[in-house]
Amino acid sequence: MLFLHSVVQGTGTLCTLAAWILLALVMTGCQSSTTSKFQLFSLATNVAQINVGYFNMCVLSANATLICKPQFTGCPGLTSISLTDVRSKFLINEVHPWMIVFSFCVCGVSFLMGVVSSLPLIGRLEFLRNIRISLSFFSFFSILVTALFAHVAVSSFVMAVGNGTQNRVTASLGKKAMIFLWCSMGLVTLTGITDSIILLVTSRTKKIRKTILEKSKVLTPSSSFSSKSSTTKY
C-alpha cells in the first residue's frame, strides 16, 4: 500500500514538473535561436520570416540570418507591417502575456508543494494535501484560460492577416506552442486526479482504522467480563 501511494504521488509530481517545463518553453519562446520555433504565430514573405513569441520576436532573413529581439522597428520584406504595432496591440490586448506568467508561477508552487508533501513526516499532514489539490485545480483553470485565449486570438489574427494582405504575407499558427499549452493543461489535470485519489484512499483508510479501533475497544470489556465469570464458576 505504501509503495503504491509513493508511485501515485511521484507520478503526480513528475506530471507537474513536465507541465512546468512546457509552460517555461512557451513563455520563453523566441528568446534565442534555440527557442525560436516555439512561437505563437509567424509571418512570412518571399524575403523574410518573423516568429512572434510572448515576450520576444525572431526574424529570419533570406540569407538564413536569425535575429531575436524584444522589438523591431522594421524588417526587410515586411515593411507593410509594423512589428512594434503587432507586439503592442495584439499580444497585450488579445493574448494577455501576464496569464502565461501567472500560470507558470502557480504550476511551480504546485510542484514545490508536491516535493514537500512527498517527505516522510511532512507528507502525513492532511492540510498540505488539500492545499496541493487546490493548487492543481487552480493551475488547471489558469492554463485552460491561457490556452483558450492564445489559441482563439492567434487563430483569428492569422486568418485576418491572411485575408487582409492579399497573399503578400503568409501567416501561420505556432503549433508547437499551442500543443505545449494543451499538454501542460492535461498534465496538471492528471496531477489533480492522482492527488484526489491519494486523498480519497487515505481518508477511507483512516475511517476503516478508526472503526476497527472502536470495535476493538467495545469488545475488550465484554471479553474480560466473560473471563472473570468463567473463573468464578470454577
Curated annotation (Swiss-Prot):
Compartment(s) where it occurs, according to its Swiss-Prot or TrEMBL record: Cell membrane; Cell tip
Gene Ontology biological process: conjugation with cellular fusion; plasma membrane fusion involved in cytogamy; plasma membrane organization
Leader peptide range in chain numbering: 1-32
Record's note on what induces expression: Expression is induced during mating.
Principal localisation: membrane
Keywords: Cell membrane, Membrane, Signal, Transmembrane, Transmembrane helix
Effect of disrupting the coding gene: Leads to a defect in cell fusion trough defective membrane fusion and organization, as well as cell wall remodeling.
Membrane topology, Cytoplasmic segments: 118-132, 200-234
Membrane-spanning segments: 97-117, 133-153, 179-199
Mode of membrane association: Multi-pass membrane protein
GO CC annotations, alphabetized: mating projection tip; mating projection tip membrane
Extracellular topological domain: 33-96, 154-178
Physiological role: Cell membrane protein which plays a relevant role in coordinating membrane organization and cell wall remodeling during mating.
Family classification: Belongs to the SUR7 family.
Record-given protein name: Cell fusion protein dni1
Annotated source species: Schizosaccharomyces pombe (strain 972 / ATCC 24843)
Gene encoding the protein: dni1
